[in-house]
Amino acid sequence: MSYPSQGHYLPPEHQYLTAATLASHGHEHLYAHSQLSDSPPRQDLAQRKRPKYTRSKTGCLTCRMKKIKCDETKPTCARCTHGQRECTWPDASSPRRRAPLRRGSIDDRPSTAGSSVSDDSSPSIRNSTPPRRFQMDSPESGLLPPPSARRNMDPFLQLPPVVAPESRHQHIRPRPPPFTPPQSEQHNLTLSPDPSEYCRYDRYDATYAQTHHLHSSHSSPSSRAPHMVTGIRGMGYSPESVHQWNSPPLLSPIESSSYQHYPLQERGMVGPSDNHHFRYQ
């Protein structure tokens, strides 16, 4: 029995690998062949494309309109001759015209400087004009502004001065002067009191006399008179002082008038006060 040689015998795994490698090598070979076959047309397309030209600012007007680069050959450039177009060039005198304009603008500056110098030299004339106006407005010249101008100027001339806040409070709240009654009123107070006070004192004296007479008639003067006096007059009065204020119920008109005026004069000399009225109420 004969066995195959080891060189020709391959296990199945190796056979599979070899097939895969052959297939991959075959695909690579085909891809490279396709690239080689496709490369010449691409190069032809790159050669066929027109070159990109930049815009020229110094070329002819026709190339500027077409936005192509001009070789600036005169009288006709190569682009215009190749495309059979009319080659037009801008006038050469236009830049020369711009230069005189610029020079003229520069030449105009000294004139403005001269005018500024003349303006600087004129302040003496300008400063001399306001005194003339004041002279015309002065009363000595006899020429016064019209009344409408005066009315417009009056509110500014007659404005009140600005007042500080402290002085404003002083203006708003002036301090009242000390009251000094005239001498005639003082004499009237001492000599002749107000007639309304006569009525008050008469009424109080009459009511007090009546109440004291009733109490003295019902009870003895030694037992109840001190209590009544302390209740009405206060703690500083005694029964002896009560008899000074008592008056008989029936008196002649002359005696009653003299009795009424005597205490009123003393009260007027002391001065009017409302404190002694509360004890009767």
From Swiss-Prot:
Q: Which residues bind DNA?
A: 60-87
Q: Spell out the GO cellular component terms annotated for this protein, sorted alphabetically and separated by semicolons.
A: nucleus
User: What SMART domains does this protein map onto?
Assistant: GAL4
Q: Which CDD domains match?
A: GAL4 (cd00067)
Biotechnology: applications noted: The basidioma development regulatory function can be useful in mushroom breeding.
Keyword RNA-binding on entry = no
Q: Which InterPro entries match?
A: Zn2-C6_fun-type_DNA-bd_sf, Zn2Cys6_DnaBD
Subcellular localization is given as: Nucleus
GO biological process terms, semicolon-separated: positive regulation of transcription by RNA polymerase II
Knocked-out gene: effects: Does not affect hyphal vegetative growth but promotes basidioma development and shortens cultivation time. Significantly increases basidioma length and number.
Keyword Nucleus among record annotations: yes
Write out the GO MF terms: DNA-binding transcription factor activity, RNA polymerase II-specific; transcription cis-regulatory region binding; zinc ion binding
Under Gene3D superfamilies, the record lists: Zn(2)-C6 fungal-type DNA-binding domain (4.10.240.10)
So what does this one do? Answer: Transcription factor that acts as a negative regulator of basidioma development via repressing the expression of genes involved in basidioma development, including hydrophobins such as Hyd-1 and Hyd-8, lectins such as JRL1, as well as the fruiting body differentiation gene FVFD16.
Protein name (record): Transcription factor lfc1
